[in-house]
Amino acid sequence: MTDASTEPTEPTAPTTPATASTTPAARTKAKVGLRIMHRRYVPYGHAHYAGNLVDGAYSLAAFGDVATEMCIVTDGDEGLFASYSDVQFRSRITAGDVIEISAEIIRVGTRSREMDFEVRVVGRGNQERGASAAEMLDPPIVATTARGVVVVP
């Protein structure tokens, strides 16, 4: 007669094949047309050129911020920027502007998200009315556009 082993054994995780419900693409909330938007004031500390002009890198950094939120919302991860394409600086951004930055998903891959980005100036100082005078712009001015790809785990 043989005795069964009485030594404790480690529980094993069930092994199930990857299914549509467990793949990264199935867990994502990323959908074409999903849009995220930020608004921010452009501080005078970012002016680098005559006339309080802000460099184009300011827009690219803002695109990175809105893309990070998009990845957190859709995939629960900050993601990583892989590339930019078709970056266009269409109008100036100056210190004191209020800008709106948007990202819209245009393609969803298994681990990648392609987005269209836009910075619009929605408010601007009006020095003619006074040193601290400002006004909202209607319509807003499109300042920077780009397309970018982020990857998520």
Label the predicted regions:
Residues 85-95:
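Short, structured protein-protein interaction patches enriched in aromatics and acidic/basic residues
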Residues 2-7, 17-56, 70:
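Catalytic strand-loop segment that frames the active site of acyl-thioester-processing enzymes
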Residues 78-85:
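Short, structured beta-strand/loop micro-motifs enriched in basic residues and often containing a Trp
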